[in-house]
Every structure is written in C-alpha cells, then in structure tokens.
Amino acid sequence: MSTGTGSLTALQDCGVLQQKVPLAEFTTWRVGGPAQWLAEPTSTEQIPELLQWARERRLPVHMIGAGSNLLIADGGLPGLTLCLRRLQGSALNADTGRVRAAAGEPLPTLARRAAKAGLQGLEWAVGIPGTVGGAAVMNAGAQGGCTAEQLISVDVIRFSDAQPSLATLSRDELAFSYRHSALQSNRHLVVAAEFQLEPGHDPAELQRLTSGNLNHRTSTQPYKLPSCGSVFRNPEPEKAGRLIESLGLKGRAIGGAQVSELHANFIVNTGDASANDIRALISLVQGEVMEAKGIALHPEVKRLGFETPD
C-alpha cells in the first residue's frame, strides 16, 4: 500500500489529517503541546492508510482516545498522533447479551445503553471518562467491576507488520491483570471490542443502579476540575487515595496542579497547570509515600512525549 499525495490531500481536505494541532483539548487534564500531525479517522478503513503514510515517512505513531489517563508533554508529540474519538457506535442484542462497540465509543454511553436494554454487567462503567478502546487497553474498572470480566474479544490493526493488517484477539490472548493488558506493550491498535453481558434484567432497575453509581462517583470525585481520573494504581490491599490522604497531601500543589481536596488519588488542573507541573506533583507524591510508608505508588497514567521515562 502506497499513500500518494492525492489520498493525503483528500484526508486533509475532509479534516481527518491536520498539522500542528494543540493537544490540550484532546486530554481530560487539558494540558499538552501540539501534535506534529494529528489524525482523527472517521472509519476503520482510513487507519491502515494513515499508518502506512506515517511508516513511509518514518514518523513515530502515538495513539489516544478520549484523553483520560494520559499526560502529554508540554512540548507536544512528534510524528503522527492517532485519535480515535470519532470512531463511535455500538450494536446491542437484548436477547443474547452480545454487545459490539467501536473503539471511540464513550464508555458511559455504552453503559447507559446496556442498562436501558436490560443488559447487566457495565453498571460500574458509567462514571469512567474514557472510551471502549482505552478501557480494553487499560483494563479499566471501578466499584468492583472491570473490563476483563465482560470483554470477549477485540479487533485490532497490527502496525508492526510490513503492511497494517486487521486481526481479532480473544480475551485469553490479552493477558489481563489489574489495570493492565498485553495491548499496552504490543503494536496493536484497538478499533472495536465485543462484550458478553447478561440479558433479561429489568431495565428500570439497571438504570437505577447505573444512576446511583454515577451519583456516588460525582459526589466523591472532583468532576468540576480537569483531571485524568485516578492517578495511581491501588497497591493492594492498600488504597492509594487513603495513603496519600493519611500524609496530609490533599491540597498540595505545584504550579497549577493540585492534589484534589475531594479525593487524594486525583490531581486536578486548577486553571493554568502545565504537564511539567503535573509530572512533578506525581513524583512528589510518590516520594512522600515511599519515605513515610515504604510503598511504591505506580501511576495508571500513560505519559507521552517526555524525554526521560519515570
């Protein structure tokens, strides 16, 4: 597959491919510098063409969804940034409980649709500010539930091959563990996922449970300020938020980044935070917890564009 100037021009003309786009608006923390190239494909068919175009130019490729659990450097990202938030849509079978969703489908939207159809299993997901694709990659979870419990398979585009190719991976191939999957370390781009939910439940009851879960999250977590969601994985059996709070770190700030006064496992952007502010505050919290408790906190956050890894 060779991508000539004609197809490139067509992608630019329809707004799929753009240059020097600020990425702050693409992350829930509202920080991050510009993408050298940003692509927002509207169909799965456009993705192999974009990947091949980047490969022919030896450009690095970065993948983002809704931008939660993501910290992009102030200097931005070189190469091609693929954002899949426009790849939306889902199909639910109320009789069998089978659900198929595009990678960019917002997880709360899917959770509400499932509840309305009487399909049990995604009530926990209603307050997670991410996409189906991101949930599969991170094994997102909340309130005792997680993606791995309902996911059957994912459709991926392999871009490590000579030519980008489509494949389907089963749950067993994804090696799920707490907030982790094999998708975090391979060259696969999730474009769709399939779930098995439990059919035949009362939609009104499921919607009540879903609303209750959302109300609990919005009352205990800082939804009024930009954040990425939970910053650190829980070092079981401990809870990261409780450890941080026990050290009096709620309200601690560096620049415009602050440990939330409402929930200590959240770092919020109070208005003028930079990615460097947030990164420094993450390191500060890790250091304080290690010194006082001897416990290493590991971020859930994916960091892109930084010169040195944490």
Swiss-Prot record:
It is found in: Cytoplasm. The keyword Cell division applies. It comes from Synechococcus sp. (strain WH7803). Cell wall formation. Its cofactor is FAD. GO terms for molecular function: FAD binding; UDP-N-acetylmuramate dehydrogenase activity. This is UDP-N-acetylenolpyruvoylglucosamine reductase. Residues 30-200 form the FAD-binding PCMH-type domain.
